[in-house]
Design a protein with these regions (language model features):
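Active-site acidic/histidine proton-transfer and metal-coordination neighborhood
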Residues: 73-122
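N-terminal pre-domain/capping segments
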Residues: 1-89, 95
Length: 122
């Protein structure tokens, strides 16, 4: 059975809820993989509380875990440590939200990084 997922916009949650209800869809959270969010426990709490306040079943929703620069196979133990920390934090966020599906990307997403890296090297 195919399912429809939408990425909820926190500044337009009513509209996101309308779509979910109208099309029997689910949320696909992409708030937490950003480094400035996953590094900030207060921001994480704020976002989680916003979603939990909707009082909806989240068990079929999907969460995108941290993936920026995650390298668990690095030769550098410090990189492995921060990668492990980000992965475990993503798991805890999923648990708090009641989400049973957690996606970790491979850190290689074509066209996602290119502009960022090019701008950083200027």
């Amino acid at each position: 059975m195919r399912r429809l997922y939408i990425i909820p916009k926190r500044d337009e949650l009513e509209k996101s809820l309308e779509i979910v209800n109208k099309y029997n869809a689910y949320f696909e959270y992409d708030d937490f993989f950003w480094p400035d969010v996953i590094s900030n426990d207060e921001k994480i709490d704020e976002i989680i509380n916003t979603y939990l306040a909707l009082n909806r079943d989240t068990s079929n929703d999907i969460l995108h875990g941290a993936f920026f620069d995650i390298t668990i196979h690095s030769y550098d133990k410090e990189i492995v440590a921060i990668s492990d920390k980000r992965i475990r934090k993503s798991i805890k966020i999923a648990q708090r939200l009641g989400v049973k599906k957690l996606v970790f990307h491979t850190n290689i997403i074509p066209n996602f990084y290119s502009k960022y890296y090019i701008n950083r090297t200027k």
